[in-house]
Design a protein with these regions (language model features):
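Negatively charged, low-complexity tracts enriched in Asp/Glu with abundant Ser/Thr
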Residues: 1-33
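Generic detection of long, well-ordered alpha-helical segments
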Residues: 3-4, 83, 95
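Short amphipathic alpha-helical segments that mediate assembly, nucleic-acid/protein binding
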Residues: 7-10, 85-89, 99-102
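Residues that form generic nucleotide/phosphate-binding pockets
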Residues: 13, 92, 108
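Intrinsically disordered, low-complexity regulatory segments enriched in Ser/Thr/Pro
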Residues: 35-87
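Short acidic, low-complexity intrinsically disordered linear motifs used
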Residues: 95-113
Length: 113
Protein backbone atom coordinates (compact mmCIF):
# COMPACT_ATOMS: atom_id res chain seq x y z
CA UNK A 1 0.00 0.00 0.00
CA UNK A 2 1.31 3.45 -0.89
CA UNK A 3 2.29 5.90 1.81
CA UNK A 4 -0.44 8.50 2.26
CA UNK A 5 -0.15 11.95 3.80
CA UNK A 6 -2.05 10.68 6.85
CA UNK A 7 0.40 7.82 7.31
CA UNK A 8 3.38 10.18 6.94
CA UNK A 9 1.91 12.50 9.60
CA UNK A 10 1.32 9.54 11.88
CA UNK A 11 4.94 8.40 11.54
CA UNK A 12 6.11 11.98 12.24
CA UNK A 13 4.14 11.96 15.52
CA UNK A 14 5.59 8.55 16.42
CA UNK A 15 9.10 9.90 15.87
CA UNK A 16 8.49 13.28 17.56
CA UNK A 17 7.15 11.71 20.76
CA UNK A 18 9.37 8.62 20.77
CA UNK A 19 6.33 6.35 20.78
CA UNK A 20 6.93 2.65 21.22
CA UNK A 21 5.45 -0.05 19.03
CA UNK A 22 2.91 -2.07 20.98
CA UNK A 23 2.02 -4.66 18.37
CA UNK A 24 4.25 -6.09 15.66
CA UNK A 25 1.35 -6.75 13.30
CA UNK A 26 -0.24 -3.32 13.43
CA UNK A 27 0.32 0.41 13.74
CA UNK A 28 -0.36 0.55 17.48
CA UNK A 29 1.92 2.71 19.59
CA UNK A 30 2.10 3.93 23.14
CA UNK A 31 4.27 6.36 25.07
CA UNK A 32 7.46 5.08 26.70
CA UNK A 33 6.88 4.18 30.38
CA UNK A 34 3.11 4.00 29.81
CA UNK A 35 1.19 0.84 30.41
CA UNK A 36 0.04 -0.31 26.96
CA UNK A 37 -3.56 -0.30 28.16
CA UNK A 38 -3.36 3.31 29.38
CA UNK A 39 -2.80 5.12 26.13
CA UNK A 40 -2.71 4.04 22.52
CA UNK A 41 -2.40 5.78 19.20
CA UNK A 42 -3.36 3.81 16.09
CA UNK A 43 -3.09 4.14 12.35
CA UNK A 44 -5.73 2.23 10.36
CA UNK A 45 -4.27 1.51 6.93
CA UNK A 46 -7.57 0.38 5.37
CA UNK A 47 -9.44 3.55 6.33
CA UNK A 48 -6.35 5.81 6.24
CA UNK A 49 -7.17 7.38 9.59
CA UNK A 50 -5.30 8.01 12.82
CA UNK A 51 -7.02 7.82 16.15
CA UNK A 52 -6.01 7.66 19.74
CA UNK A 53 -7.56 6.40 22.92
CA UNK A 54 -6.85 7.14 26.53
CA UNK A 55 -8.25 5.12 29.40
CA UNK A 56 -10.31 6.45 32.29
CA UNK A 57 -11.07 3.20 34.06
CA UNK A 58 -8.73 0.47 35.18
CA UNK A 59 -10.99 -2.19 33.74
CA UNK A 60 -9.84 -3.00 30.20
CA UNK A 61 -13.31 -4.19 29.18
CA UNK A 62 -14.76 -0.81 30.16
CA UNK A 63 -11.99 0.84 28.17
CA UNK A 64 -12.98 -0.98 25.00
CA UNK A 65 -16.70 -0.39 25.58
CA UNK A 66 -16.35 3.31 26.29
CA UNK A 67 -14.85 4.57 23.07
CA UNK A 68 -16.76 7.54 21.75
CA UNK A 69 -16.44 9.78 18.74
CA UNK A 70 -14.41 12.52 20.39
CA UNK A 71 -15.68 13.87 23.58
CA UNK A 72 -12.65 15.26 25.28
CA UNK A 73 -13.25 13.14 28.34
CA UNK A 74 -10.05 11.18 27.91
CA UNK A 75 -11.72 8.12 26.60
CA UNK A 76 -12.41 8.61 22.98
CA UNK A 77 -11.20 8.31 19.48
CA UNK A 78 -9.77 11.10 17.42
CA UNK A 79 -10.28 10.72 13.73
CA UNK A 80 -7.29 12.33 12.18
CA UNK A 81 -8.73 13.90 9.05
CA UNK A 82 -8.45 17.52 10.12
CA UNK A 83 -5.65 19.69 11.42
CA UNK A 84 -7.70 20.33 14.57
CA UNK A 85 -7.80 16.60 15.31
CA UNK A 86 -4.03 16.46 14.81
CA UNK A 87 -3.55 19.30 17.28
CA UNK A 88 -5.71 17.48 19.83
CA UNK A 89 -3.71 14.26 19.43
CA UNK A 90 -0.52 16.22 20.03
CA UNK A 91 -2.08 18.05 23.01
CA UNK A 92 -3.06 14.75 24.63
CA UNK A 93 0.40 13.29 24.00
CA UNK A 94 2.06 16.33 25.60
CA UNK A 95 -0.27 16.20 28.62
CA UNK A 96 0.25 12.50 29.06
CA UNK A 97 4.01 12.81 28.69
CA UNK A 98 4.00 15.50 31.43
CA UNK A 99 1.92 13.19 33.61
CA UNK A 100 4.42 10.34 33.14
CA UNK A 101 7.35 12.67 33.87
CA UNK A 102 5.69 13.79 37.14
CA UNK A 103 5.21 10.17 38.20
CA UNK A 104 8.82 9.35 37.32
CA UNK A 105 10.07 12.40 39.27
CA UNK A 106 7.99 11.45 42.33
CA UNK A 107 9.32 7.88 42.20
CA UNK A 108 12.91 9.15 42.00
CA UNK A 109 12.35 11.49 44.96
CA UNK A 110 10.84 8.60 46.91
CA UNK A 111 13.90 6.44 46.16
CA UNK A 112 16.24 9.11 47.54
CA UNK A 113 14.15 9.71 50.67
Amino acid sequence: MEETETKRKFLEIVKEFGLQHKSVNSYEYTLPNAKPTDFLIFYNEDKDIIYCAKKLRSDYKDYINNYCDWTFGFTGIVYYKTNRARQRVIKILKQYKQHLNKIKKLEMEKDFA
